[in-house]
Amino acid sequence: MEMGKMLVVYMTLGYPNVQSFKDFIIGAVENGADILELGIPPKYAKYDGPVIRKSYDKVKGLDIWPLIEDIRKDVGVPIIALTYLEDWVDQLENFLNMIKDVKLDGILFPDLLIDYIDDLDKIDGIIKNKGLKNVIFTSPSVPDLLIHKVSKISDLFLYYGVRPTTGVPIPVSVKQLINRVRNLVENKLIVGFGLSSESDLRDALSAGADGIAIGTVFIEEIERNGVKSAINLVKKFRAILDEYK
């Protein structure tokens, strides 16, 4: 059976509080999230937009590891940790061991191609030698040849961020950006980093994206209307994805 379009759901670990976070994650999976990205607050959130930065501030000081263990017991879909390599590069082996110990499936470092491109092959090897997935983040500023290369080594999917930071608009259309890379990518192409409106989603899917990654809009919805309302958004996005086979 052909797999439908993928819904990748992001949430900052522990946001807005531990219980609400758990409720949202479980509800998201029950309503169609295929993969979870859990954000580990970094020291400097260079490539995150204001909404996600604010969510990091709200959970500062939280002991994330027991929380990850709890979530892992509750859901069966793949879970990827999302955090900055800059914070862990000097203790990468130890960090990856912790990721493995709490039974996460892999890691996504948004700064890998931007700030550590010379170490790409080495870091990819270290991650995979631990038995973890390395999900690679790329963007319109990455050269075509590099997008093509990393699409072949990225695990699960290639994450293509269409905006310079999460939730910040850009002048070029989503369709144009995806048309440029679709033929370069030998992998599942997941589009995110600022998708929020229904028209953005539909544009991405009709241009050939294999799925979407959404986070900012869920954080905003939890802030405004609570967890149940954010779970309803997951359900809504799942229904849109299911229109495209």
UniProtKB/Swiss-Prot annotation:
Top-rank taxon of the source lineage equals Archaea
Q: Which cysteines are joined by disulfide bonds?
A: none
**Key word Amino-acid biosynthesis present in the record?**
yes
According to its UniProt record, the EC number is 4.2.1.20
GO annotation terms (biological process): L-tryptophan biosynthetic process
Which Gene3D superfamilies does the protein's record reference? Answer: Aldolase class I (3.20.20.70)
What's a GO cellular component annotated to this UniProt protein?
Answer: cytosol
Q: Which PROSITE patterns match?
A: TRP_SYNTHASE_ALPHA (PS00167)
Reaction(s) catalyzed by this protein? (1S,2R)-1-C-(indol-3-yl)glycerol 3-phosphate + L-serine = D-glyceraldehyde 3-phosphate + L-tryptophan + H2O
Q: Which residues form the active site?
A: E37, D48
Its annotated pathway reads: Amino-acid biosynthesis; L-tryptophan biosynthesis; L-tryptophan from chorismate: step 5/5
- InterPro entries named among the record's database cross-references: Aldolase_TIM, RibuloseP-bd_barrel, Trp_synthase_alpha_AS, Trp_synthase_suA
A Gene Ontology molecular function term of the record: tryptophan synthase activity
Q: Which Pfam families match?
A: Trp_syntA
Q: Which family does it belong to?
A: Belongs to the TrpA family.
Q: What does this protein do?
A: The alpha subunit is responsible for the aldol cleavage of indoleglycerol phosphate to indole and glyceraldehyde 3-phosphate.
User: Quaternary form?
Assistant: Tetramer of two alpha and two beta chains.
Q: What NCBIfam families does the database record attribute to this sequence?
A: PRK13125.1 (NF009621)
List, alphabetically, the HAMAP family matched: Trp_synth_alpha
Instruction: Write the protein's name.
Output: Tryptophan synthase alpha chain
**Annotated organism of origin:** Saccharolobus solfataricus (strain ATCC 35092 / DSM 1617 / JCM 11322 / P2) (Sulfolobus solfataricus)
Name of encoding gene: trpA
